[in-house]
């Protein structure tokens, strides 16, 4: 069994490090990402996904934080995919407003992952829909997707989430 297969097995046990590694595989794309996608799609596990979108400074992170707090008050597990602009230097995510979610950083019932848009228009990363499915496979029943600050024509989130706010 190779390391990726071990990570996929570890996902079922709730291993957060394995989840982070598998999400990195999905973000990189290629054959390994397709293998993950095939396994996850065959499982039929899809979480409830809620897209949070709006113009820069509209309060997306503040709203996401409040929604996460509400679900955690009900003892529900919740994941957040926060799509950020890509750094022109590293290509990675510029960690924008994550400071508003710091109160959840040590909560084992919350998983927060920043993803770089990598120049993709529409407020998402190309890997976002598959990352949502991976989170569902890993046992996260609700996923909030916070987009990069977007304008009126960037509506990719409406196709990637069950509900859009």
Predicted regions span which residues?
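Nucleotide-state-sensitive switch-loop elements of NTP-binding domains
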Residues: 3-50, 55-58, 64-165
């Amino acid at each position: 069994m190779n390391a990726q297969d071990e990570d996929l097995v570890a996902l079922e046990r709730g291993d957060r490090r394995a989840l982070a590694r598998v999400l990195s595989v999905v973000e990189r794309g290629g054959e390994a990402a397709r293998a993950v996608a095939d396994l996850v799609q065959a499982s039929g596990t899809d979480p409830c996904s809620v897209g949070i979108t709006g113009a820069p400074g509209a309060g997306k992170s503040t709203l996401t934080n409040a929604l996460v707090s509400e679900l955690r008050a009900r003892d529900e597990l919740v994941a957040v995919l926060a799509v950020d602009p890509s750094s022109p230097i590293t290509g990675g995510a510029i960690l924008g407003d994550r400071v508003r979610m710091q109160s959840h950083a040590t909560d084992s019932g919350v998983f927060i992952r920043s993803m770089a848009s990598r120049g993709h228009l529409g407020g998402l990363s190309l890997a976002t829909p598959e990352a949502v499915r991976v989170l569902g496979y890993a046992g996260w029943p609700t996923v909030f997707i916070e987009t990069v600050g977007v304008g009126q024509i960037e509506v990719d989130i409406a196709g990637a989430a069950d509900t859009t706010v």
